Every structure is written in C-alpha cells, then in structure tokens.
Design a protein with these regions (language model features):
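An N-terminal-biased, well-structured beta-alpha scaffold segment characteristic
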Residues: 2-103, 107
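Glycine/threonine-rich flexible loop motifs
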Residues: 12-17, 78-83, 91, 229, ...
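Generic hydrophobic/aromatic pocket-lining and core-packing "Φ" positions
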Residues: 23, 47, 80, 101, ...
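Rossmann-fold NAD(P)-binding glycine/threonine-rich loop
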Residues: 95-123, 265-319
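Adenosine-phosphate binding glycine-rich loop
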Residues: 121-159, 290, 296-373
C-alpha cells in the first residue's frame, strides 16, 4: 500500500507522524512510503534520514495523494482538498468534534482517530494520549521552573538556606504522575489531588502527599471510579469540598500544575480566580487543560498572563516542545495501530470485530460511524 507522511502545517505543530525507524518497518512489510520534503525538520529528522530508511521524498501533493495518510492532527481545509475520496487517514483527529468528522466523511475518507482507542492493556502500545501526556507532564514542570523566580530544591549554602518549592498537582493521570516524578527529581515538596481514589497509592509511591477529599454519598463514590480509565464529572457537593481543599493548599503552593480533562467536555474548573488572587506573588500556574477551556478561568490558551503577581501559563501543545521524542513515540503508536488494519500479506482490512479498530473508526464510505451527543 502507498503510505503518505505530510508536513504538519497547523500553527505551533512540530511533530511528524513517522520516523525513519517506523518507515523502515513499513517498507519491510512491503509498503511504499512517500514523505513530504521537510516533514521531519522540526522533529530533528532530515529528508536524507527518511531516504536512507527507504522512503521517497516528495511534495505535499505526493504525500496527500497516497492511499493511506499518517497525520499528527486533523487536516485543514486546504489539505483536505488534496486528499482523494477513498483514502485512509490515521492520526489524532479529535473524535469529539462532530464538525471535523463530518468534513472527513463528506470527502469520502476512511478515518481512524487514535484518541478514541479504549484504555485497555491490549491498546497500551498505541495509546497516543498517554504517550503525549507523559511528555507534557515532564515539560510542564520544566516550564514552571523556568518561570518560577526561585530554586526548586532546598539548598544549604554559606549565605543561608533556601527552602524547597512547594508544588501542587491537580489531576493524577499520565501527565500528572509524570509531573510528580519530574518535580520530585528537582527536589520539590509535592502534594497531588485526583477524583479517583485508586491513584492515591500511585501518588504516594512517587513521593507526593495525596490531598484526600472524602466521599460522602454513593453517587460521589460511583463517579469517582470513572469510566474506561477516564474521570467523570463529579457531583457539585464533592466539587465544593475539593475546591476548599485546593484553595487552602494553593495559597501555600509556589507552583500549581493542573491536568484535569474529561473527554469531549470542557475542562473542569479546579483553580478559581479567587484562589489565584490569594496565591503568593511569584507563584506559577501551568494549566495543561488550556486547549479545552482550562482548569483555571484566568488561563489564556498559548499565552503567559500575570494576575495579582501570579504567572499563569496556558500551553496547548507541550508535547510539541519535545518534538523529537514526541514524534518517535507517536510514530510507534501509529505503527502498532497499523498492525491491526493490515493482514499478514500487507492488505488493508477493517475488522470491526476488533474493539480497538471499531472504537477508532470515525467514518467510512461517506458515512459518520461515530456520533457524539
């Protein structure tokens, strides 16, 4: 099959959907691969590296004219115009955007959005959300350290002792846990909160203190369990108690990193404007939910703002700041997914009996398969 790897043109996107490592494996399976010239430059992969792996370097028309296209994000309108009806598209296509999926269906594209893969052990190797969130959690701490006007670790010097930074992490999914681990390596004192009681042990195993907000009703306990590894919206009663606990700890914190997301919904508010107003001058907030509205109402996507002396950062693509490794991990995720849609003979086949394939299939034959509420 002819596989195309175009240059990502979305503003700020630095990643590429295939690396020489994964392309070599695809060619070894009998496929032909065309990479758009310059596609990997921002991820530290030059055209000659792709050629050495066996790929052909071509234009945007060449890459988008392939039978199967590997992308990082959904194609723009101008890119859609280059894609033929019947083409297969695989990438992070925003499965919760009805408008995006409808456009792909109108163009006759067979689209697979890997964000929709189930959170099961079998799907771990192609879990793009986890591979990219892991990087975002790491980079969030480094971004916080960059803006924080003090040291992170405790230092004892001849000029006196410097206290360790106090870090509060809200949301202990993949990004949150990596943020805990990274902040710990930098010598910070860490507290972390999450709606799911099951992560308490994980938080403590990384050296952080769990901010415990007890459940008072069966409804609260049921919602806290989550669905498919994701958090669910919590009842108002619990959110009010959690907000109070966060408020008190945020006032003492030097750095707050928020990571809470709910698939297909606006990000929950975890850090109120009133809380920010009472935080210490010079403290830093890194809002990893900025792309979905933010966990703090003062967050502005892709900007750094200062409110009452508090520095608030709203990055929407932190994984892209580590483009080389983010691309390498993402490309491996795609490669593992392609194993599910190619037969041993290298023929493309959609097996809807496979729960991963069925979950990721957004549209085919002009019809939207996944419909969001």
């Amino acid at each position: 099959m002819h596989i195309g790897v175009p240059l990502e043109t979305q503003t700020g996107e630095t990643r590429v959907a295939a690396t020489p490592e994964t392309i070599k494996k695809l060619i070894g399976q009998g496929h032909k691969v065309t990479v758009q010239s310059g596609a990997g430059i921002k991820a530290s992969v030059v055209d000659s590296a792709y050629e050495t792996a066996g790929a052909t370097i071509g234009s945007a028309n060449d890459a988008f004219g392939a039978e199967l296209i590997l992308k990082v994000v959904a194609p723009s309108d101008s890119e859609l115009a280059l894609i033929k009806s019947g083409t297969v598209l695989v990438g992070m296509l925003n499965p919760f955007s009805n408008e995006t999926i409808a456009k792909l269906a109108e163009h006759g594209i067979t689209a697979f959005a890997l964000e929709a893969a189930p959170r099961t052990s079998r799907a771990q190797s192609l879990d793009v959300l986890s591979s990219q969130a892991n990087i975002a959690g790491y980079k969030a701490v480094l971004l916080a350290a960059h803006h924080y006007p003090r040291f992170m670790p405790m230092l004892m010097t001849a000029a006196g002792t410097v206290k360790a930074a106090r870090v509060l992490i809200l949301g202990a999914g993949v990004a949150g846990l990596q943020a805990i681990a990274t902040a710990k390596r930098l010598g910070a004192v860490i507290e972390a909160s999450d709606v799911r009681p099951a992560v308490k042990e994980q938080i403590e195993s990384l050296g952080a203190k769990f901010v415990d907000v007890p459940y008072e009703t069966d409804e609260e306990r049921e919602c806290a369990v989550g669905v498919g590894g994701y958090a669910r919206p919590m009842p108002t009663s619990w959110m009010q108690r959690q907000a109070l606990a966060v408020h008190e700890r945020a006032k003492q914190a030097d750095i707050v990193i928020t990571t809470a997301l709910i698939p297909g919904r606006k990000a929950p508010t975890l850090l109120s404007a009133d809380t920010v107003a009472q935080m210490k001058p010079g403290s830093v907030v890194i809002d990893l939910a900025a792309a979905q509205g933010g966990n703090c109402p003062l967050t502005v996507a892709d900007q750094v703002v200062v409110e009452n002396g508090v520095i608030i950062c709203g990055p929407t693509n932190l994984a892209g700041a580590v483009a080389a490794d983010a691309s390498a991990l993402y490309a491996r995720n795609l490669l593992d997914f392609l194993k599910l849609v190619f037969t041993k003979e290298g023929q493309f086949e959609i097996n809807l009996e496979d729960d991963i394939v069925a979950a990721c299939l957004m549209c085919r034959d002009g019809q939207v398969i996944r419909k969001n509420a």
